[in-house]
Amino acid sequence: MKAVVLAVAVLFLTGSQARHFWQRDEPQTPWDRVKDFATVYVDAIKESGRDYVAQLETSVLGKHLNLKLLDNWDTLSTTFSKLRADLGPVTQEFWDNLEKDTEWLRQEMNKDLQEVKQKVQPYLDNFHKKMQEEMERYREKVGPLGTELREGARQKLQELQEKLTPLGEDLRDRAREHVDTLRTQLAPYSDDMRQRLTQRLEALRDSTTFADYQAKASEHLKTFSEKAKPALEDLRQGLLPVLESLKASILSSIDQATKQLTAQ
């Protein structure tokens, strides 16, 4: 299972680098993407959660039970923010170490990508050239038909459509042929890249780096657990006033209902 987790993590990291290698953009680290998503998600939950709490407190049941949930909601939000802040550096350190430990693998994969790119570039250039020629050929055949339409008005529109249909179908069929040819030409290189990636992952699995990573991952989980304990305890303490208030309100309502039944 650990090997699967590591493989996915490596693919995630190298995949990100490979995508930016082709696009030539500045890569965003995996932790940055996680932080961006988590921040937006948590902020949305905080806002929507406060709305739900306000609705519950102002409802008939909330008024009857004399709930004071909003008094504690801001405290809970602060507690969640503190929890996120406390655990953030630990996770950041983990991603930094993982990126550093797999830097050699990313470099090897980038070399492989560069080599494959150089090999397939002639096929891509030829494909682009063929498609340009097909489009020029199509324009040369369609151009006179446009002139004919302008000169012949509406009655020739149907004739123009009949003439354009086979031309469009011919262009489509020839384009498909070029795409199929390109796919056939690139297939060996795709298989080669897949085989290279498999070899890199097998080498990683058999290397001492993998054993070191397992030890570091265990250490990280232990540190994460130790860091999380006080933060989770703060969260529990923040929840206690809400639970106690709700418990007291419910017991009070039950007591009042019992007295009313006894009086009857």
From Swiss-Prot:
Similarity comment text for this entry: Belongs to the apolipoprotein A1/A4/E family.
One term of GO molecular function: cholesterol binding
Assembly: Homodimer. Interacts with APOA1BP and CLU. Component of a sperm activating protein complex (SPAP), consisting of APOA1, an immunoglobulin heavy chain, an immunoglobulin light chain and albumin. Interacts with NDRG1. Interacts with SCGB3A2. Interacts with NAXE and YJEFN3.
Entry-annotated residues carrying Methionine sulfoxide: M109
Protein name: Apolipoprotein A-I
Cellular compartment(s): Secreted
Signal peptide bounds: 1-18
Post-translational modifications reported in the UniProt record: Glycosylated. Palmitoylated.
Alphabetical list of Pfam families matching this protein: Apolipoprotein
Chief site of localization: secreted
Any single Gene Ontology cellular-component annotation: spherical high-density lipoprotein particle
Protein source organism: Chinchilla lanigera
Matches recorded under InterPro entries: ApoA_E, Apolipoprotein_A1/A4/E
Keyword Isomerase: no
Annotated stretches, region: 10 X approximate tandem repeats: 67-264
